[in-house]
């Protein structure tokens, strides 16, 4: 194994991609590798509060990340600076040893799923309502509702939560069901290891004999030809045997680069649904649910402050809440809006960029093409109105966080499929139409000046 300090830096680099910036900077950034004793990696935490939090929340993630990098199974032990002697430490109960892939039971125990990610703990809002409904339908009737179910959206918006929730629901209602959740990176790494060890049949048996396959971040298969080939056959086997497949990505299938057309086509067989960033009301609801689950007593004004400042994704939002609570505990002061501002000053930009709304887009597009605002919501189909309306829908999809149904509502209650059609049409035209490119550029420049 490589030098433990180099290894720890690599581990931190991988974990930084998986968790929110506030969580990483609060809990992991200041940690250091201390030593490796047998199969236990000892990590220095800055204080006892951080040590206990890391042990209860991050041991499993760290162990899995180390295994992904090295193929080694290590126990994780956190210590604090005044107590760095390794002679007398005891293993923490939460530091589990992870078995190697082909020593794992083919029963795929429920422990593979995060117990906190259930439908009950999922906060429904306008940006995720359709994805939640589709996920619940799949969980209630695997391989009968939508197969595959393809969920896409930005980092930290709840895709993984829904996938785990599906797994929990299926197991709860059918304890004998074989449910497996994994990332595409883990699928790739296990496939490589199986080829290296000349055990491809073990790998295939493992993933082609399940009832529900939940595979996260499928975009990372892009460019990996052999792995795509293997997943193609895994997909076919499961689909032909009426087994449920749920896939997540940060973008829709058609936008994943270097993805084989035959895979792209299969991903589009079922239902494709997106998740967009939560609106203010949903962000506040998420904070309330998180605070209740963790036993935090947070004043409403503090939750409102955090929700107003963090609007990117749920992971960042919850990470900010944890950072505020940690800061309050460490300096032994009551949680207030002022304390929250102090705790979050390093992660909140001093000036936030203006949020562009659908109304902004309609106004600027209307001025550009000399059409009235009410025309965007009217039923007129003349080209002089319909084409600018499609451009406005396209820009609403590109420049706002609004869901497809929300965009449709703002254009006279049109169906979300109309928005999809408009976006696809303008996207295609932009590839060859220089005049349209000029229009879009001019409109975007005007929007930036608002």
UniProtKB/Swiss-Prot annotation:
SMART domains: AAA, Bac_DnaA_C
One Gene Ontology biological process: DNA replication initiation
CC terms in the record's Gene Ontology section: cytoplasm; plasma membrane
Region feature (Domain II): 79-111
Record-linked Gene3D superfamilies: 1.10.1750.10, 1.10.8.60, 3.30.300.180, P-loop containing nucleotide triphosphate hydrolases
Localization: Cytoplasm
Region (Domain III, AAA+ region): 112-328
Keyword Translocase: no
Region (Domain IV, binds dsDNA): 329-450
Primary location: cytoplasm
GO molecular function annotations of the record: ATP binding; ATP hydrolysis activity; DNA replication origin binding; lipid binding
Domain of life: Bacteria
InterPro entries: AAA+_ATPase, Chromosome_initiator_DnaA, Chromosome_initiator_DnaA-like, Chromosome_initiator_DnaA_CS, DnaA_C, DnaA_dom, DnaA_N_dom, DnaA_N_sf
Keywords: ATP-binding, Cytoplasm, DNA replication, DNA-binding, Lipid-binding, Nucleotide-binding
UniProt: ATP binding residues: 156, 158-160
Residues covered by region (Domain I, interacts with DnaA modulators): 1-79
NCBIfam families per the UniProt record, alphabetical: DnaA, PRK14086.1
The family this protein is said to belong to: Belongs to the DnaA family.
Function field: Plays an essential role in the initiation and regulation of chromosomal replication. ATP-DnaA binds to the origin of replication (oriC) to initiate formation of the DNA replication initiation complex once per cell cycle. Binds the DnaA box (a 9 base pair repeat at the origin) and separates the double-stranded (ds)DNA. Forms a right-handed helical filament on oriC DNA; dsDNA binds to the exterior of the filament while single-stranded (ss)DNA is stabiized in the filament's interior.
Free-text comment about domains: Domain I is involved in oligomerization and binding regulators, domain II is flexibile and of varying length in different bacteria, domain III forms the AAA+ region, while domain IV binds dsDNA.
Subunit-level organization: Oligomerizes as a right-handed, spiral filament on DNA at oriC.
Full protein name: Chromosomal replication initiator protein DnaA
Annotated organism of origin: Geobacillus sp. (strain WCH70)
Upper classification of the organism: Bacteria, Bacillati, Bacillota, Bacilli, Bacillales
